[in-house]
Amino acid sequence: MSDFAPQTAGGKVLWHFTMSLDGFVAGPDHDMTWMQTGISERPGFIQQYVETTGAILGGRRGWDMFPDAGNVYGGDWTGPVFVLTHHPEDAKPADRVTFLNCDVAEAVRIALAAADGRNVEVLSPDIGRQLLERGLIDEIDLHIAPVLLGDGIRLYEHLGGRPIYLHRVGADDPTAEVDVRYRPAAA
């Protein structure tokens, strides 16, 4: 969207993801290779998050698949990373990474304190869902990639849950749907 305003720092809790058009943030087994082919970013995309992010909060399953905290935003961002887990004792230590065994609300409090007035990015579908249900997500920052995965890890999956209505930030009508139009890429 050309009218999309850049992210700003302000001590917000952001649920931040790139998602396939069919709602997956990762393929099966947290596979992320789909993001490395045929997907481009708008200019300045990475830099705005590097500048506004004070801390990262993620989950253990994602961490175990990608345990390189130094590679957040291609290595351009440095700061505290918090990994929420029920078993911190068997986690492999890493620089700037703290493994937490606590409630999600406590994890957010810890991350916000460490973020020093900047934003906390939540990079876990499950943790994000729990925080959203508790009213602890300030914004959902979502980037829709022009790809259909068909299987994998959904951004939001809460079978039997109630709908959660959202307001679009910066829109004249915050309840308006977002229209996108794609065509299949040539093989």
Regions from the language model: what does each represent?
Residues 1-187:
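Enzymes that bind and transform nitrogen-containing heteroaromatic metabolites
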